[in-house]
A protein has these predicted regions:
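An alpha-helical support segment within catalytic cores of ATP-dependent transferases
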Residues: 5, 128-140, 150-193, 262
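Juxta-kinase regulatory segment immediately upstream of eukaryotic protein kinase catalytic domains
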Residues: 1-17
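Active-site activation/catalytic loop segments of kinase-like enzymes and analogous catalytic loops
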Residues: 152-161, 222-258, 273-289, 302-309
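ATP-binding glycine-rich phosphate-binding loop
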Residues: 15-33
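ATP-binding pocket architecture of kinase catalytic cores
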Residues: 33-149, 153, 160
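ATP/Mg2+ or Mg2+-diphosphate-binding catalytic cores
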Residues: 281-337
């Protein structure tokens, strides 16, 4: 693919690029490259010709409407690769990092967010003028069929993966009710629905926002993109800021459409619920099945958004809300309640009963085998005791093997926790196993949990699986 991009670049400029640099991937199967030279361009390679054609058509249409999007300069004969403007390296998501991490957005961050949200009505209405929606991919419009696609995406790729039991017929009834509510929110005049209008898909160059990743856009309700932007899982916007940005949006919307704020909010909440479920479906597929870390890390944030939505209630969808409430209360989503803190799960277990499964989906951490350490369980006086009992503790510490063992595991775990804190990760799992999950593993897990809780400002979820002990040590 890079050879195709280099050929396109040479045909366009008359010379080869100075270098080709692979860029981090996102949620799709497209690959991105920076081709440095005069000029520097972004190369895109996709697996779907139809998806690429949609982006190229929309880019050219939006440019004709004087909307800030990257220009497409060259397309390969097979339609799978193309070159577009390089908008730099600053995404809106990166530029609001301080606010996202602290929950306190400064004036510069707020001004930038307001500039972006005021751009949205232009995209929705001016972008729709003269647009051939038949060229949109994979759907022409937001309709009954596409809504049910997304709801079933959530059901099969996320809800079923959690293990929550539910009645298919009752859930489908509420899906249908939500579908009808959403269809009623459509405007009679054409509105372009960006679909994934969120801070990762906004680049900022010379202080001005530019739009990328709009190839999934279609005709749809104006509420959807507001929901996508303001309820982005990891954006961490406080409700007061959301209200400010809604006011900015409604003010910018006036030249195109007049709508009372109360009416707008009453319709928006249903779209926010739908968008949250759609996002969880994507996180389930991209995270649980494709094992992409960014999506797994975003799940606790989306769960917290859902938890807040359910507090307001949706009497129109009683069974759906009941199922969602049970889902948000699952143990694997406990970290979402303390989403600014890392949660480390420390567990003891018996190898006879299998290695514990990481229910967070993250798959990060260690499984330490304690079976090489001198076993108190071999002696009659300790067989009925556990690694929490004083006689077993004294035996292990006097023997000394476990002290040396834990000196090494502490060093590994401490470095891992420190790095996860620096990178803003939400979950790490540390397991200690022995033959019966009673003596050595219990002592080791207890020691490690207390050590981590004392040393770091983190939540420690301590589980002695075979002893049926489950304890959450909250960050100090």
């Amino acid at each position: 693919m890079t050879q195709t991009l280099e050929t396109l670049y040479s045909q366009l400029t008359g010379h080869a690029p100075e270098s080709v640099e692979a860029l981090p991937g996102a949620g799709s199967n497209r690959s991105y490259y920076r081709l440095k030279g005069t000029p520097t361009l972004i190369g895109v390679c996709g697996t779907s010709r139809e998806e690429n054609e949609a982006f190229i058509y929309l880019s050219r249409h939006f440019q004709a409407q004087h909307l800030p999007v990257p220009a497409v300069h060259a397309v390969s004969n097979d339609g799978l690769c193309y070159l577009q403007d390089d908008l730099g390296t600053d995404s809106l998501f990166q530029l609001i990092a301080h606010g996202r991490e602290t929950g306190e957005f400064g004036s510069t961050e707020k001004d930038l967010l307001k500039k972006v949200i005021r751009l949205l009505p232009r995209i929705q209405f001016e972008g729709a003028q003269g647009l051939d929606f038949g060229k949109c991919y994979p759907a022409v419009e937001f309709n009954h069929r596409s809504i049910l696609w997304d709801l079933n995406y959530f059901k099969y790729c996320f809800l079923k993966a959690t293990g929550v039991e539910f009645r298919e017929d009752l859930l489908e009834d509420d899906f249908e009710a939500l579908c009808q509510t959403l269809i009623k929110s459509m405007e009679p005049q054409p509105v372009f629905m960006y679909r994934d209008f969120q801070s990762r898909n906004i680049m900022v160059k010379d202080g001005e926002p530019y739009l990328i990743d709009f190839q999934g856009g279609r005709k749809g309700p104006l509420y959807y993109d507001v929901a996508s932007f303001l309820w982005q899982a990891k954006a961490n916007y406080p409700d007061s800021l959301r209200q400010e940005l809604i006011d900015e949006y409604l003010e910018a919307l006036r030249p195109y459409k007049q709508i009372e704020k109360e009416v707008f909010l009453s319709r928006l909440r249903h779209v926010v619920l739908f968008r949250t479920l759609q996002v969880l479906g994507a996180y389930g597929f991209r995270g649980y099945f494709e094992k992409k870390t960014h999506f797994i890390e975003s799940i606790p944030f989306a769960i917290e958004n859902l938890r807040q939505l359910l507090q307001e209630g949706f009497p129109e969808y009683p069974y759906l809300c009941e199922v969602l409430q049970r889902m948000t209360e699952l143990k694997q989503f406990a970290a979402a309640r303390n989403r600014r803190n890392l949660t480390v799960t420390v567990m003891s277990f018996s190898y006879r009963k299998g290695i514990p499964e990481d229910e967070s989906g993250n798959g990060g951490g260690y499984v330490f085998d304690c079976r090489a350490v001198h076993n108190p369980g071999r002696y009659e006086q300790y067989k009925s005791l556990t690694g929490l009992d004083r006689p077993v503790i004294e035996f292990l510490e006097k023997d000394g093997e476990i002290t040396e063992f834990l000196r090494h595991t502490d060093a590994l775990v401490d470095a891992h926790v420190q790095r996860f804190l620096e990178r803003g990760f939400s979950h790490l799992m540390i397991c200690f196993g022995c033959t019966g999950g009673q003596h050595r593993s219990v002592y080791s897990a207890q020691h490690t949990a207390m050590h981590l809780h004392k040393k770091f400002k983190i939540n420690v979820h301590l589980i002695h699986r075979e002893q049926q002990i489950d304890q959450l040590l909250k960050a100090k």
